[in-house]
């Protein structure tokens, strides 16, 4: 298990005027449209003014430099990392602002495109997207398919309806109905727990998988699901935005790095993106952006890496 990260407390997401409220969080995934911006009204703090760095820009592969724009696939249903602003079109979030800053360092523009989470890695692999930015946990399975550039650490958090009416115990959720977003690291987590239930002679967990996290959250709010699990900042953002309708269960666990997804043959681009992340970490832009989202004390890293050794990090108890 990874080293602990300080946890969110209620109210930490209120630094920006969260005008979208619960309605923005619970937008149906079918309403997700393309967006081309990372700024956006009322969320996060003031976007830092990031200037191009000539040395970093020189690392960008020539074909990308000639294009001048990185096409980035993201699932815009995963607040506060990536989600739609109140206009229903512009994609905002801390993931978006961080990568926009990286692109600015590399003297590149970004074209953000909404996509279903489970299609983004394939989209990068096929060349549809240059990069995938969508709170992707770096794991061995993904590293076998693509390059990944680390930029943030986060674990899994359980949450349920206020007062826990279904009496859900994350360590023994046998027979409960649990909501998760499809294709996330939470799916094998809950599947393993369900298998253990059956081995122990207990009823299996009913696992409800949804294309978007907003839909999974709504199923808990509506009472269709007893509880859910998601990446920690997403779970606490849902709790914040739904007022008194949700609450956390226990603490986060198994913290691991998020990574930007780059084609397996695009080593130069991956290295350039890593250098961009490292630059914003070193000059304080990284912390400034995360602070604007109430995340300055959660999951920050000091060193971005291309394809970090996950097994070694687990053994060392780090990240």
Describe each PLM feature range.
Residues 79, 91-104, 136-137, 154-212, ...:
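Bilobed "Venus flytrap"/periplasmic-binding protein-like clamshell domains
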